[in-house]
Amino acid sequence: MKDLFWHLVGIATGLKILLIPAYHSTDFEVHRNWLAITHSLPLNQWYVDATSEWTLDYPPFFAYFEWLLSQVAKYVDPRMLVVDNLNYESKATVYFQRLSVIVTDLVYVLGVRSCLGSLGLGRDTQQFFAASMLLLLNVGLIFVDHIHFQYNGLLFGILLLSIGSLIRQRFLWSAFAFAVLLNFKHIFLYMAPAFGVYLLRFYCLEQASVVSAVGAVVKLLVVGLTPFAVSFGPFWQQLPQVLSRLFPFKRGLTHAYWAPNFWALYNAADKLAAGVLKVQDGGASTTSGLVQEVRHSVLPAITPPVTFALTALFMLPILVKLFRSAKKQSPLVFLRAVVLCGCSSFVFGWHVHEKAILMVLLPLCLLTLVNREDARYAYVLGIAGYFSLFPLLFDADLYIPRYSLYMSYVAMMYGQLYRIFPGFRGFHTLEWLYMLGFMAIPLYEHLLSFLLHLDQRLPFLPLLLTSVYSALGVLYFFGAYYLYALGISWGKVPIASSTSAAAVKRKRKTK
């Protein structure tokens, strides 16, 4: 098989260009406002200005990134850089911001190629081609970045560069890249325990002497803290204000649309119990659609410390497994630790957005190449996780694109897994039934709700069904995959397989 990587890059880029005129969310105005703030206001006003409700709440490296973009934007349409010009979206502005996402996806492309190379995959193998397809044509990134509008490709590109460096045992480069990533978007802090344990165990503690180990720790601290010094240094006098923007705990337990996690089921159980017991809401409703603090009617109130404690508790087993793993097996355990740390934060985190499922889905694409069990769990989560992003694309004009892109991607994913693992059909009956159950949600949303005249009486029900039903799959994946990762038999499949497409074909023919 030829190296078709750059062909896939071209196909992905063409698709992204076609989506430029598509609907975009309020996040488009968020980033336009950040362009205006960083271009028009002095540095000490960046994290203070509140002209728009969409205040700057990403770490300083992302603010510097917006400033760099603004230096180009001023030649495209300077009116987009006026702070008071709220909700401004000229055609030039739309094209500029859309193209800025596409161009910065180059970092993601480099991250994918680097990471797959670090796994030892030959560029002419079926595994390399399959992983390239799953990552470069990832439907989640297409939904979130190139329709909804964000810059996740840039961020996940840096993450993949860090992972690739770690697997190649370029520990300091990995630590540096991950520290840079944290200063672009602090949500990746939830993956930091996996990186920290790996670097401590397989870099610092692998040194020949105590002196060398101490030296390794010092190097890591210098390399890791330097990006923070460069990032936050100019804001030292305003550090409390910056941190209050980065960690706004008054936003409430869940977002307006419940991310498909444990708290979605918790909220649903509270609503059900309140209905059965005929208890009236004692505060802001969890289904009000507003970003605010809420009170549960029946179940105990949840506070940020509770969510942090649960997140840390559920990260602990895989981190212990990583620390105790043999060096030869450590890259595989590390990748699973990254996935499960990300999933722990998604399942139990405070005010989690549905988009955060990408922190689990994208690293999991790397693990689909390991063996059938990883692939099986990845597919189940993919069905639920990518479907849970549909509420981001609520405009009626997007129904056909969202369903066609989703169905094409999951079909492509199944086809590639079948080629890597001939005879791949390893789903349990309940898994099949669960995945097929997703067809009922659009059937209700687009047909039954109108036939039964429920579209006006219960307009929120499709969102509720999407959130709760997807949450069942996410929690199933989290529990089942966690148990699998902790009890894995390491002798079955190496992390890097040399199986070529020709070998796969021979194997299939001899069955």
Swiss-Prot record:
GO biological process per UniProt: apical constriction involved in gastrulation; dolichol-linked oligosaccharide biosynthetic process; germ-band extension; protein glycosylation; protein N-linked glycosylation
A GO term, aspect molecular function: dolichyl pyrophosphate Glc1Man9GlcNAc2 alpha-1,3-glucosyltransferase activity
Protein location: Endoplasmic reticulum membrane
This protein's UniProt keywords: Endoplasmic reticulum, Glycosyltransferase, Membrane, Transferase, Transmembrane, Transmembrane helix
GO CC entries: endoplasmic reticulum; endoplasmic reticulum membrane
Catalysed transformations (reactions): an alpha-D-Glc-(1->3)-alpha-D-Man-(1->2)-alpha-D-Man-(1->2)-alpha-D-Man-(1->3)-[alpha-D-Man-(1->2)-alpha-D-Man-(1->3)-[alpha-D-Man-(1->2)-alpha-D-Man-(1->6)]-alpha-D-Man-(1->6)]-beta-D-Man-(1->4)-beta-D-GlcNAc-(1->4)-alpha-D-GlcNAc-diphospho-di-trans,poly-cis-dolichol + a di-trans,poly-cis-dolichyl beta-D-glucosyl phosphate = an alpha-D-Glc-(1->3)-alpha-D-Glc-(1->3)-alpha-D-Man-(1->2)-alpha-D-Man-(1->2)-alpha-D-Man-(1->3)-[alpha-D-Man-(1->2)-alpha-D-Man-(1->3)-[alpha-D-Man-(1->2)-alpha-D-Man-(1->6)]-alpha-D-Man-(1->6)]-beta-D-Man-(1->4)-beta-D-GlcNAc-(1->4)-alpha-D-GlcNAc-diphospho-di-trans,poly-cis-dolichol + a di-trans,poly-cis-dolichyl phosphate + H(+)
Record-annotated membrane-spanning stretches: 4-24, 94-112, 124-144, 151-171, 210-230, 300-320, 332-352, 356-370, 377-394, 432-452, 469-491
Secreted among keywords: no
Pathway as given in its UniProt record: Protein modification; protein glycosylation
Summary of the function given for this chain in its UniProt record: Adds the second glucose residue to the lipid-linked oligosaccharide precursor for N-linked glycosylation. Transfers glucose from dolichyl phosphate glucose (Dol-P-Glc) onto the lipid-linked oligosaccharide Glc(1)Man(9)GlcNAc(2)-PP-Dol. Functions in developmental processes such as germband extension, the apical constriction of mesoderm precursor cells and ventral furrow formation in early embryogenesis prior to gastrulation. Involved in the glycosylation and intracellular distribution of shg (E-cadherin).
Protein name (database record): Probable dolichyl pyrophosphate Glc1Man9GlcNAc2 alpha-1,3-glucosyltransferase
Encoding gene, per UniProt annotation: xit
